[in-house]
Amino acid sequence: MAHKKGASSSRNGRDSTSKRLGVKRFGGQFVHAGEILVRQRGTRFHPGSGVGRGGDDTLFALVSGAVTFGTARGRRVVSVVPAQPAATPAQPAATGS
């Protein structure tokens, strides 16, 4: 009996590479606009305020702020609460002398 099957045959299929899906930024974390929040197949999480959805259902931040997770109408929703701009003291006008 041959222990090799012969030409053009394969022992077994090969495993596919992992796609690194899942939540990338968690609740309470500060994010900048454009950062990826969730990589997913299908809409396990839905975009809330301040969040956009890409063609592959990736959720990303539209504004800078803190990430929040919640539910709306029975759906899991990811939102970004915009950060309050830090109050900067007024700079005195520079004098020439």
From Swiss-Prot:
The keyword Ribosomal protein applies. Residues 1-23 are annotated as: Disordered. GO terms for cellular component: cytosolic large ribosomal subunit. GO terms for molecular function: structural constituent of ribosome. Keywords: Ribonucleoprotein, Ribosomal protein. InterPro entries: Ribosomal_bL27, Ribosomal_bL27_CS. It comes from the Bacteria. GO terms for biological process: translation. PROSITE patterns: RIBOSOMAL_L27. It holds the Pfam family Ribosomal_L27. Belongs to the bacterial ribosomal protein bL27 family. NCBIfam families: L27. This is Large ribosomal subunit protein bL27. It comes from Acidothermus cellulolyticus (strain ATCC 43068 / DSM 8971 / 11B). The lineage of its organism: Bacteria, Bacillati, Actinomycetota, Actinomycetes, Acidothermales.
